[in-house]
């Protein structure tokens, strides 16, 4: 039984999106279940607020615990941010253990494996006690599926009819992107906005390449063409294009 389910991977690979997708799926398909999603910083703030109010309002701390313990599914994002927060970790694990002992599901995410989080060994062991999954950078097929998913998500959010983005444009977005899912999502949004601003379904691959030219921080390496190589060679050896491609061979050109 994958409980807890621990998902990790470097920033930008879509962990938050995945946790939100779990939340949305359960809310849509199992509305009788109570789902709680919290970023670790939000959980920390909830705990600090409850602790600070505890002296004047005895129920505050109890209400804090009840809120989390009444969840059927608890999703906690970026748990590595709880490093050094011993009291918060302690209370989180009390909640954690109570939920799992009742057969309720806990899903956690982090930007590194449990063994690399600077917390007490017993917490690491507990993180590893269910299922631990490493999210890898997506392949092109996966990125294309993500592009299509973001388009559907945008359609549902805007409710302004279907977005007829050409297939070759979708492929171009996927191929141009790196591994950062947030950047991929914003690229899809940028293309949709451009389409809505007058381009419509006539938007081309050339339009998209120009639009996203400097969008991706970790995009694929630029493909070098023969002209690219010639240009670098000409600049380095201080020779002309004609000298390189012509039949004349001086000493400098021969070295080039």
Question: For the regions a protein language model found, what residue spans apply to each?
Answer:
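Terminal-proximal interaction/regulatory segments of ATP-powered molecular machines
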Residues: 243-256
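Conserved AAA+ ATPase "sensor/coupling" helix adjacent to the nucleotide-binding pocket
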Residues: 130, 144-158, 194
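Conserved catalytic/switch belt of AAA+ P-loop NTPases
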Residues: 84, 89-109, 121-126
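C-terminal helical "lid" of AAA+/P-loop NTPase domains
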Residues: 168-175, 182-197
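Short glycine-rich substrate-engagement loop in P-loop NTPases that contacts/grips substrate
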Residues: 32-73, 86
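Short regulatory helix/loop adjacent to the ATP-binding pocket of P-loop NTPases
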Residues: 51-52, 114-129
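Conserved AAA+ ATPase "SRH/arginine-finger" region at the nucleotide-binding site
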Residues: 118, 130-143
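Walker A/P-loop nucleotide-binding motif
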Residues: 2-20
């Amino acid at each position: 039984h994958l409980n807890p389910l621990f998902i990790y991977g470097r920033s930008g690979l879509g962990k938050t999106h995945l946790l939100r997708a779990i939340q949305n799926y359960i809310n849509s398909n199992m509305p009788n279940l109570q789902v709680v999603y919290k970023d670790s910083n939000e959980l920390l703030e909830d705990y600090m607020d409850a602790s600070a109010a505890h002296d004047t309002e005895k129920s505050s701390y109890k209400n804090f615990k009840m809120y989390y313990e009444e969840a059927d599914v608890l999703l906690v994002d970026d748990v590595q941010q709880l490093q050094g927060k011993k009291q918060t970790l302690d209370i989180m694990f009390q909640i954690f253990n109570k939920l799992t002992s009742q057969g309720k599901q806990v899903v956690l995410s982090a930007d590194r494996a449990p063994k690399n989080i600077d917390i007490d060994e017993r917490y690491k062991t507990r993180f590893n006690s269910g299922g631990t999954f490493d999210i890898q950078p997506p392949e092109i097929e996966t990125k294309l599926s993500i592009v299509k998913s973001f388009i559907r998500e945008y359609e549902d959010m805007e409710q302004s009819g279907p977005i007829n983005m050409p297939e070759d444009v979708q492929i171009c977005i996927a191929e141009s992107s790196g591994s950062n899912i947030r950047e991929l999502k914003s690229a899809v949004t940028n293309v949709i906005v451009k389409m809505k601003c007058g381009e419509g379904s006539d938007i081309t691959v050339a339009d998209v390449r120009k639009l996203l030219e400097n969008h991706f921080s970790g995009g694929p390496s630029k493909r070098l063409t023969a002209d690219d190589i010639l240009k670098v060679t000409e600049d380095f050896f201080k020779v002309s294009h004609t000298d390189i491609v012509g039949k004349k061979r001086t000493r400098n050109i021969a070295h080039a």
